Amino acid sequence: MAPNLRKSHPLLKMVNSSLIDLPTPSNISSWWNFGSLLGICLMTQILTGLLLAMHYTADTTLAFSSVAHTCRNVQYGWLIRNLHANGASFFFICIYFHIGRGFYYGSYLYKETWNTGVVLLLTLMATAFVGYVLPWGQMSFWGATVITNLFSAIPYIGQTLVEWAWGGFSVDNPTLTRFFALHFLLPFMIAGLTLIHLTFLHESGSNNPLGIVSNCDKIPFHPYFTLKDILGFTLMLLPLTTLALFSPNLLGDPENFTPANPLVTPPHIKPEWYFLFAYAILRSIPNKLGGVLALAASVLILFLIPFLHKAKQRTMTFRPLSQLLFWVLVANLLILTWVGSQPVEHPFIIIGQLASLTYFAILLVLFPIIGTLENKMLNY
């Protein structure tokens, strides 16, 4: 019999073992679709970003007009830009759902996979931040100024570090140039980290909604899950194109239609919606260094999740108390997101402080306690 190239070719057999003949639990739900959706998001963003970079000029005097030129004069430039800007929002929607699914179903017990995933999230956040600066509108400029300024809160080396990052004494041309370089580089780092993430995942195989070993009941990835993933792609690309074509500026800030002006500060400086929860936590602490530490902790806390798992069951499928707490956490994050978009005045200040406190309390205190309580209730 002739050798099967798919299984014998050095490169194809790697693709085969990770995308075609991969043994997959038969009962994984649609919540497991978001990993592949993130892959599609990354490819879309790299492609549209590459096309945008061909028409972009990383110079403070030309950046804003080069983006306007792309939208007005380049064939389908408006579409490429709208897909890229809104694609970032969908990227974050998918990654937040993906993390939520991992949290709900105890996937974080695959520690290496989880930790590389958190590193991927941090890299994605860095990429989105430097990318938002590139159009050089008012919110781009002031967002860059406010966030980079936070590094000055680091004792002793802070101010030097900030000036080194800026390449001067304020956000200016050198800052824009290096942010463009970083925005070009980081997505390829994300692609590399994704391969590491998948390598660790395929060491153990996928988790499933029951959280039990499913080796006795696995099915090949192709055709079952390739088809399911294609359905997922369609269901994601449909709202993305709808948003990009009908209301492309819905999620953007109107302030960014004004070219950057260091002499005029916008009334409300706020980041894109996907950073608002962290921004609300940052603002809820009246001390600069304390706020920076809380901001860092709000994301870095994900590294601690595997160590805070006290329940004897892996998933929350049969743990109603943990489920309740999980949805309280989701509601809490939505409140933080809303508060982050509001001005710093009563009652938003106190709401933000309470929501920030609740966020850390749920993750660090309540989840381990509830897990232990459920063990007692189930006589484990």
From Swiss-Prot:
Entry's cofactor comment: Binds 2 heme b groups non-covalently.
GO biological process: mitochondrial electron transport, ubiquinol to cytochrome c
Binding-site residues, heme b b562: H84, H183
Subcellular location field: Mitochondrion inner membrane
InterPro entries for the chain: Cyt_b/b6_C, Cyt_b/b6_C_sf, Cyt_b/b6_N, Cytb/b6-like_sf, Cytochrome_b, Cytochrome_b_C_euk/bac, Cytochrome_b_N_euk/bac, Di-haem_cyt_TM
Gene3D superfamilies in UniProt: Cytochrome Bc1 Complex, Chain C (1.20.810.10)
TM ranges: 34-54, 78-99, 114-134, 179-199, 227-247, 289-309, 321-341, 348-368
Topological category with respect to the lipid bilayer: Multi-pass membrane protein
Family: Belongs to the cytochrome b family.
Additional facts recorded: Heme 1 (or BL or b562) is low-potential and absorbs at about 562 nm, and heme 2 (or BH or b566) is high-potential and absorbs at about 566 nm.
Protein name: Cytochrome b
